[in-house]
């Protein structure tokens, strides 16, 4: 904030502000010193989607080091942010500073934690006051947690990611500036389409029902998917929601969001197993779960769902251990830790009597959380496990989503600068 140029008569205000005092947010005050300080709420340090969002934010704001720009986004949360510059629509080149950042993990070990974000925002605001010019969050839940801080500055810009219905209402009321929609309907429909194709033994399961109509009457996913054969991933693009277009999406039920180009197919009902990494996750509960429940009938699935604690894999793996061979025709896994894919495959290989010599055709599809190595890179090797003929990942394009979030922030700042 620009305090040094304030009149002498405002000395008391200067002293208060320099000690982290707060007043309602305004662009005039935020931009006065030509420095934009932001605070970043990180979901999970070693999560590739979290890292991709962090990379997108820092790249857009100029705070990702030049030496890191050519690297994979997977290590972005472990990188050190640098002082950057950003030229806005008013012709001013602002200095950009990541004044605070941190993983939002609770005492039980659960990451992406909304309540922790509330405490974090309170602490950072108490420390810096109006010296923070805006907040950015790796997801909507933490953004909502932040605005719930007891000392939250009225009008403080904050940007989320996930397009939770509650966040859309906050965008309508001006408390959150924007979010990124993961295209939940396309993710849910795409996951079930791919699982159905594999169960039914359809040729070209990543094409049938995606770029061409389903051979078994399930229609065609309306959103474009991009298939990467190297790591067996099926990715759908994200899109931005701000005050300009929020009315197109707010207040919609899951039934409103169902892809009408997907239709009820003709193959028999089968039993499938599906895990959710955290029973308390806002995005999964409000966006994904209701869609899956509707799509289950469309794809003739009898779904057994299991819900994790967000801290470790124990609840999901113990449930999986209890399954018997023949209980399920497909397994759809939403991991807590993205490095845990191999442990799930080991359990399933034992259950299904699968070996490299006698691989199983039972599909195993990871969803929304992509398998990574300890270094945070997409784990192409685990996705080629020779014990399984059908291993895939279905989710959103994390890198494209991170870039969109970064651009959304810059667009907002440009609008403020032009006002």
Give the label of every model feature segment.
Residues 1-5:
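Positively charged n-region of N-terminal signal peptides that target proteins for export
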Residues 14-18:
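C-terminal motif of bacterial Sec signal peptides marking the signal peptidase cleavage site
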Residues 20-419:
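A residue-level marker of the well-folded mature domains of exported/periplasmic proteins
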């Amino acid at each position: 904030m620009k305090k040094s140029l304030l009149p002498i008569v405002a000395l008391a205000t200067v002293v208060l502000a320099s000690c982290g005092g707060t007043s309602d947010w305004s662009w005039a005050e935020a931009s006065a010193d030509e420095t934009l300080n932001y605070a970043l709420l990180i979901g999970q340090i070693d999560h590739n989607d979290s890292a991709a969002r962090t990379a997108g934010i820092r790249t857009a704001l100029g705070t990702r080091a030049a030496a890191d720009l050519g690297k994979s986004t997977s290590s972005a949360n472990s990188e050190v942010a640098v002082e950057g510059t950003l030229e806005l629509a008013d012709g001013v080149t602002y200095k950009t500073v990541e004044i605070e950042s941190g993983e939002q993990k609770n005492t039980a070990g659960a990451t992406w934690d909304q309540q922790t974000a509330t405490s974090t925002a309170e602490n950072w605001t108490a420390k810096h006051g109006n010296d923070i010019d805006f907040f950015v969050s790796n997801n909507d839940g933490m953004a909502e947690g932040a605005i719930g801080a007891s000392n939250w500055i009225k009008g403080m810009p904050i940007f989320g990611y996930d397009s939770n219905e509650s966040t859309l209402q906050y965008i309508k009321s001006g408390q959150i500036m924007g979010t990124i929609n993961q295209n939940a309907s396309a993710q849910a429909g795409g996951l079930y389409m791919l699982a159905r194709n594999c169960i039914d033994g359809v040729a070209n399961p990543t094409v049938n029902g995606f770029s061409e109509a389903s051979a078994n009457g399930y229609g065609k996913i309306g959103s474009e998917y991009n298939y990467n054969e190297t790591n067996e991933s099926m990715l759908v693009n994200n899109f931005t929601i701000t005050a300009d277009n929020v009315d197109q999406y707010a207040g919609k039920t899951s039934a409103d969001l169902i892809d009408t180009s997907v239709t009820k197919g003709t193959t028999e009902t089968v039993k499938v197993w599906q895990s959710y990494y955290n029973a308390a996750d806002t995005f999964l509960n409000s966006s994904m779960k209701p869609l899956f429940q509707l799509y289950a009938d469309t794809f003739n699935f009898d779904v057994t769902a299991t819900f994790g604690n967000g801290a470790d894999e124990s609840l999901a793996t113990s449930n999986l251990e209890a399954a018997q061979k023949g209980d399920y025709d497909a397994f759809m896994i939403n991991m807590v830790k993205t490095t845990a894919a191999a442990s799930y495959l080991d359990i399933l290989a034992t259950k299904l009597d699968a070996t490299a010599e006698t691989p199983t055709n039972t599909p195993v599809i990871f969803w929304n959380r992509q398998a990574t190595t300890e270094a945070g890179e997409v784990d192409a090797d685990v996705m080629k496990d020779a014990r399984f003929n059908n291993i895939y990942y279905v989710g959103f394009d994390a890198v494209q989503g991170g870039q969109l979030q970064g651009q959304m922030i810059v667009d907002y700042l440009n609008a403020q600068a032009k006002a």
